[in-house]
């Protein structure tokens, strides 16, 4: 349980095995979590700005209200991840799997969804993305 922990900026934690972890309210600024296994984890209301999650597995993780400004989720598994109310400014989701992810009330600005699978995802306005939602949420 790492609830409310503040980690030193710029930590290299790539390849970490952290499934079912509680990282709510934690601070991980500029942290490298590439290729990490973090499925079913709770990152709610944490600060993960400028962090890297390339090819990380965050399947069914809770990311509600967290700050991911300028973070990189390229090719990450974010299936059924809950981003409700999260800050997603300048985030890179290129080629990531966001199937059935929840973006309700999230602040998405200048994010890159090129090649990302958004099928069945719930968009910021509550509408569900249709079957042709690759790279963009099509109703």
Where are these regions (language model features)?
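Tandem repeat scaffolds
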Residues: 1-139
């Amino acid at each position: 349980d790492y609830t409310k922990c503040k980690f030193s900026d710029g930590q290299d934690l790539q390849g970490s095995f952290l499934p079912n972890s509680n990282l709510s309210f934690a601070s991980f600024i500029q942290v490298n979590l590439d290729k990490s296994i973090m499925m079913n984890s709770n990152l709610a209301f944490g600060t993960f700005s400028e962090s890297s999650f390339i090819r990380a597995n965050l399947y069914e993780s809770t990311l509600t209200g967290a700050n991911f400004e300028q973070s990189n989720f390229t090719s990450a598994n974010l299936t059924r991840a809950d981003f409700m109310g999260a800050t997603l400014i300048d985030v890179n989701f290129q080629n990531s799997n966001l199937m059935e992810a929840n973006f309700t009330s999230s602040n998405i600005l200048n994010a890159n969804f090129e090649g990302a699978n958004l099928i069945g995802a719930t968009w910021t306005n509550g509408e569900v993305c249709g079957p042709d939602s690759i790279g963009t949420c099509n109703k």
